[in-house]
Swiss-Prot record:
Function: Quinone reductase that provides resistance to thiol-specific stress caused by electrophilic quinones.
Protein name: FMN-dependent NADH:quinone oxidoreductase
Subunit: Homodimer.
Keywords: Flavoprotein, FMN, NAD, Oxidoreductase
Annotated EC: 1.6.5.-, 1.7.1.17
Catalysed reactions, as listed in the record: 2 a quinone + NADH + H(+) = 2 a 1,4-benzosemiquinone + NAD(+); N,N-dimethyl-1,4-phenylenediamine + anthranilate + 2 NAD(+) = 2-(4-dimethylaminophenyl)diazenylbenzoate + 2 NADH + 2 H(+)
Record organism: Staphylococcus aureus (strain MSSA476)
C-alpha cells in the first residue's frame, strides 16, 4: 500500500480552476484504480506553513546547542517538523498549482522550504549534495493562461522548472507533468484544453 500526498495550491476549486479540475480527475481515478492506497489532501491555502524567519533560524540554532526555545520558536519549529515528517511518510506526491507571475503561488515555496532539510531529504558529502528521496514519485499539474512549454515565452517559465529542479536535487527519480496551457491566449479553445487535461489526468492516474 502506498501513501499519496495530494498537495494543492489554488484558492479556488475545480469549478473555477483548470488545474484543480485535472487534479480532481486524477485523484478520483487514482483512488478507483488503487483502492488500497492512502490519499491525504493538503490544501496549502488552508494549511499553516511557517516561513523560515528569525524565530525558526534561532530555534534551530538553540536546538543544536541544547538551549530552551521561546514559545514562538517552539511552535514554528515543531510545526515545520510535523510538515517534514508527513512529507517523508509518503511515497508519491501530486502537486497542483496555477502559474502566477511565471512561477507558482508563494505558499508552494514555503512548503518546499519546509521539506528541503539537510539530513532529512538531502545530505552534504565530499562529492556535493545528495538527494535522499530516491524511492519517491512526483506529479505536477499546472495551469497556464499562455503558452510556456515551447515558443518565445518558454525561457520565462519558472514554476515547473523550479519544482522539477528541487525534486531532482532531493533525489526523486520519477517526475511527471500535466501542463494545461493556452486558455487565455485562445479563449475559444478553453473547453477543449480543459477536457484534454482531464483525459490526460485520468490516463496517467492508472499507471502512476
Amino acid at each position: 500500500m502506498a501513501k499519496v500526498l495530494y498537495i494543492t495550491a489554488h484558492p479556488f476549486n475545480e469549478l473555477v480552476s483548470n488545474s484543480m479540475a485535472a487534479g480532481k480527475a486524477f485523484i478520483e481515478t487514482y483512488q478507483q484504480q488503487h483502492p488500497d492506497d492512502e490519499v491525504k489532501h493538503i490544501d496549502l491555502f488552508e494549511t499553516y506553513i511557517p516561513v523560515i524567519d528569525k524565530d525558526v533560524l534561532t530555534g534551530w540554532g538553540k536546538m543544536s546547542n541544547g538551549e530552551t526555545l521561546t514559545d514562538d520558536e517552539q511552535m514554528k519549529v515543531s510545526r515545520l517538523s510535523d510538515i517534514l515528517e508527513e512529507f517523508l511518510s509518503a511515497d508519491k506526491y501530486v502537486f497542483v498549482t496555477p502559474m502566477w507571475n511565471l512561477s507558482f503561488p508563494p505558499v508552494v515555496k514555503a512548503y518546499i522550504d519546509a521539506i528541503s532539510i539537510a539530513g532529512k531529504t538531502f545530505k552534504y558529502s565530499a562529492e556535493g549534495p545528495q538527494g535522499l528521496l530516491t524511492d519517491k514519485k512526483v506529479l505536477h499539474i499546472q495551469s497556464r493562461g499562455g503558452y510556456y512549454t515551447e515558443g518565445p515565452a518558454a525561457d520565462f517559465e519558472m514554476g515547473d522548472r523550479y519544482l522539477r529542479t528541487i525534486m531532482t536535487f532531493l533525489g526523486v527519480p520519477s517526475y511527471e507533468t500535466i501542463i494545461i496551457e493556452g486558455h487565455n491566449a485562445e479563449p475559444h479553445k478553453t473547453e477543449e484544453i480543459k477536457a484534454t487535461s482531464i483525459n490526460n489526468a485520468e490516463k496517467l492516474a492508472t499507471i502512476f
